[in-house]
Amino acid sequence: MKNIIKKSISQIFSPSDSEAIVQEAQKQIIRQLDAPSRRLFLQRGLTLGGVAMLTGCDISDNASVENALGKISGFNDRVQGWLFGSTRLAPVYAESMITRPFPFNAFYAEDDAPEVDGNAYRLKIAGLALDKREWSLPTLYKMAQVSQVTRHICVEGWSAIGKWGGVPFGDFLRLIGADLTAEYVSFKCADQYYTSIDMATALHPQTLLALTYDGQILPRKYGFPMKLRMPTKLGYKNPKHIEVIEITNTFTGGYWEDQGYNWFGGS
């Protein structure tokens, strides 16, 4: 693994003729950036020597900084992908440890959460799948479901334990004849949110197409009619109010990812 990482670093960054003190570089870069997401990325996302790698860029040049950050973010995505696997499971907890009330979190106020008509709702499938029929909630509710008590970890620094129930997403993808060799699965939501994940995460045994919370139909504030629950990912990677699922080889980014958040977003 060490050799792979060294090779990737050499491919991403050209040799620098100057040296810089890593801590001072980090301080100056943080001062250059106004976006909270970028500061957070520097403080929490620059792993595996990422800050040291920045010393080859001109930190007085915002464009240079942005370019370096993009390269490091992509590098982090690849490293997280290398470390990820179906046998690496997130911890599970006893129901007595559930956080009550479970916090609401979104890029809007709770009262502004979308009101989706469950009777009219149809989940749409797009992209590389054989079966593109639309799915009603009654049909989805009839599918075999499992539940999990896992920790939701927010990029903002807080966490909470909750109980989600739903259809293992890998089972659903196989049922619709999704191309499991495709690179990505992307999601479009009723609240205008969007994100995407890699296929390995989609097929992970703990990734759920969540339809319930704490034994009840998924409440509006938690993502009715469905959300993708991934305890292996940070909270912003777990889309709510899902309307469209697309299997694709085209990278589609995400709402927060397009503003600087790490795309892989592993927790």
Task: Give residue spans per PLM region.
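Structured, non-membrane catalytic/scaffold regions adjacent to prosthetic-group chemistry
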Residues: 8-9, 25, 60-267
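N-terminal secretory signal peptides
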Residues: 1-37
